[in-house]
């Protein structure tokens, strides 16, 4: 049987967090003969591994020939925000069950995308299921080392400046390494209604009245839901003043929450005053997208311990947790 030509001019398009479309060019004489495609997909750092030594052995992905471009989809082998290399081979399945195969095409590289809004909506729904009842609170707080606040006063005009979010949480979160903001907490002790006296982030705490950051002029977005191989679960929320740069970033990427009615963090008017509540059973990480003036709050030293084991800095999400994972790339 006549040999197959080698596929060439590989094109990868329509890339999402767990799928892509691929097409290539092959000789017209092969179009009617080819019955299968072999697709060799590798994470970029391993792009030279796992090439099969024998031309007649199928590679990782085997697909029946379909009109191109074809969609490759599967969260079991594709992860978001990950660089891959891909090469293809065409084949004709013969009557004896063996394959006549072409040579390998050139290798091309691409990077998968972030979670889309519909994926984040699935995470949001999972987080809502364990959020628990709502508790009242009155302040947002941020713990850090004394030198951090001294630097803000001396070199930043008494302002806490937004910084780039790290890679903690879900690997597919569109905020990681992209959104600038100032991190705050709001969780309170069940028995006192006050912020806890322990913190993993430093012994100095800046507290600011909740209404300074969260009010009807603020948009609230759901950004992530994760755990770190422990029983604790974290939800990341974004507070962005309406029309701000951070608000424009979030608008196209994150689910928007009703500030007065959601399962995580609310601001509502009761008896003519703003009342704030947070979910009891989630540790909330709040990202405020604008600079924060230290003169709007108070700074003091906490009496508890610095619990480093609870730090979420660059924390990796547990990919096996059924509570906080969805059926797309982790």
From Swiss-Prot:
Name of this chain's protein: Phytanoyl-CoA hydroxylase-interacting protein
Assigned keywords, A-Z: Glycoprotein
Sections of the chain in a coiled coil: none
PROSITE patterns found in the cross-reference section: FN3
Example of a GO MF term: protein tyrosine kinase binding
Source species, domain of life: Eukaryota
GO biological process: protein localization
Organism: Bos taurus
Positions of transmembrane segments: none
GO cellular component labels: cytoplasm
Family, as annotated: Belongs to the PHYHIP family.
Role: Its interaction with PHYH suggests a role in the development of the central system.
Glycosylation site list: 14, 325
Assembly description: Interacts with PHYH and ADGRB1.
Domain Fibronectin type-III, first and last residues per copy: 6-115
């Amino acid at each position: 049987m006549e040999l197959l030509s080698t596929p060439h001019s590989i094109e990868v398009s329509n890339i999402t967090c767990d799928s892509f479309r691929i097409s290539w060019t092959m000789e017209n004489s092969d179009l009617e003969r080819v019955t299968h495609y072999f697709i060799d997909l590798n994470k970029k750092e391993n792009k030279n591994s796992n090439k099969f030594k024998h031309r007649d052995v199928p590679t990782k992905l085997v697909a029946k020939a379909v009109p191109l471009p074809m969609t490759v989809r599967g969260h079991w082998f594709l992860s978001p925000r990950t660089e891959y290399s891909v090469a293809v081979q065409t084949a004709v399945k013969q009557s004896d069950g063996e394959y006549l195969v072409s040579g390998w095409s050139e290798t091309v590289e691409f990077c998968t995308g972030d979670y889309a809004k519909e994926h984040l909506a699935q995470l949001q729904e999972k987080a809502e299921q364990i959020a628990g009842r709502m508790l009242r609170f009155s302040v947002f707080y941020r713990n850090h080392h004394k030198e951090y606040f001294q630097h803000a006063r001396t070199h930043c005009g008494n302002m806490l400046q937004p910084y780039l979010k790290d890679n903690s949480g879900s690997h597919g979160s569109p905020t990681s390494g992209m959104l600038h903001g100032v991190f705050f907490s709001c969780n309170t002790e069940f028995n006192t209604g006050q912020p806890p006296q322990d913190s993993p982030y430093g012994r100095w705490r800046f507290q600011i009245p909740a209404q300074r950051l969260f009010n009807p002029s603020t948009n609230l977005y759901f950004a992530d839901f994760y755990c770190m191989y422990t029983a604790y679960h974290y939800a990341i929320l974004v507070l962005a003043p309406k029309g701000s740069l951070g608000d424009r970033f979030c608008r196209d990427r994150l689910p928007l929450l009703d500030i007065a009615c959601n399962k995580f963090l609310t601001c509502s008017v009761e008896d003519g005053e703003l009342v704030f509540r947070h979910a009891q059973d989630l540790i909330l990480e709040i990202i405020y997208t604008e600079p924060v003036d230290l003169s709007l709050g108070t700074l003091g030293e906490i009496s508890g311990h610095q619990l480093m084991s609870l730090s979420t800095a660059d924390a990796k999400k547990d990919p096996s947790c059924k509570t906080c994972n969805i059926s797309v790339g982790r």
